[in-house]
Every structure is written in C-alpha cells, then in structure tokens.
Amino acid sequence: LRQVQAMSATTSAAEPLLRVLRTACRLPLLAWHLLVHLPVTLLLIAIDTVGGKRVGHLAIRWWARGLLWVFGMRVRRIGTPLPGGTMFVANHLGWIDIVALHSQHMMGLIAKAEIRGWPLIGWLAKAGESIFLQRGNAHSLADVMAEMSQRLRAGHAVGVFPEAGTRDGRELGPFHARIFTAAVEADAPVQ
C-alpha cells in the first residue's frame, strides 16, 4: 500500500513537469503545421481537382489528421463513412469535433454565420465548404436547407450538429429535427 501511495505521489508530482514538456514539444510542431502545412493545404484547396481527384478534399483530411496528431489525439472510427451525398450527424463538444470529422471524411458542415467573419477560422470554414446559418432567421434556415438538399443530391456530404450548439458530452440537448428534412428531400442516407 505504501509503495502504491509513493508511486502515486511521484506520478502526481511529475505530472506538471510532463505537461510542460509535452507543451514544449507540441508548440514547434503546431507552428510547423500552421506555417508550412496550412499554406500547402490552402494551395491544394485552390487547385481543387487533379486528374479527376478532389485534391482539396484530400488536403483538408490530411491537414486535419496532422492537427490531431500535433495535439496527441487519435480518432477511433467505427465503420466506414458512406460515399457520396450522405448527411453525417454528430454531437458537438467543441471545435475539435470539426477537425475530427474532417480527418475522416470531407463534408460541408453547418456553421453559425458569425464564423465567416473570424480571421483565418472563417476562411478555413469557407474552404471547408461550410454552409453558414444566421441563427434565428427563418429565411436563412430555408436557404441552408435548400443548399443542403442541393449538395446531397449532387453527391456531396453534409455534416450537422442537430443540437445546434456545443454541449459538455454528459447529456444530449434537444435535436432540431427540421434539419433532417434536407436528407429526406434529397433521399440521402443519414449516418
């Protein structure tokens, strides 16, 4: 028992130092990822298609996977994303959800309109084919629904967070069921 307590005390005393060391290692990796990999990704997004392949989509997936790696995160995927016009549904705990989803499959996510004006993040959201929604505006919602249906019919994936906001992960919030109408109208699968 004393040995276990001593190990526990040593581990907890070493934890702040380990955290500092992890951060010291990750900061240069993050800087490299933002200063080198991001411009390469943006260039590939601008090129978009090479030989019929969507290199922009591949670049976004590559960049998202790299960012997760820099932060020491791993995604455990169960199953395979359906190809083509599929509506992907996920809980929304924070910004990392977007990166995790894009690391697995390219999709245009529904985002609040304010994000469009954010420095760098807004541009990345546009490059990631986000569909912007002005919250509380019925006309904007109708436009978003029409855009989602059109993209799904055209064979492009769309991602939604039906709780329409972030949660702490302990409980589900109410779903905005109307968002699923786009998949029904487009006769698209939901995953």
Q: Where are the regions that the model predicts?
A:
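Short, Lys/Arg-enriched N-terminal segments with co-localized hydrophobic residues
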Residues: 1-6
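A transmembrane-helix-recognition feature enriched in membrane-embedded lipid enzymes
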Residues: 9-76, 123-128
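Soluble catalytic domains of membrane acyltransferases
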Residues: 69-191
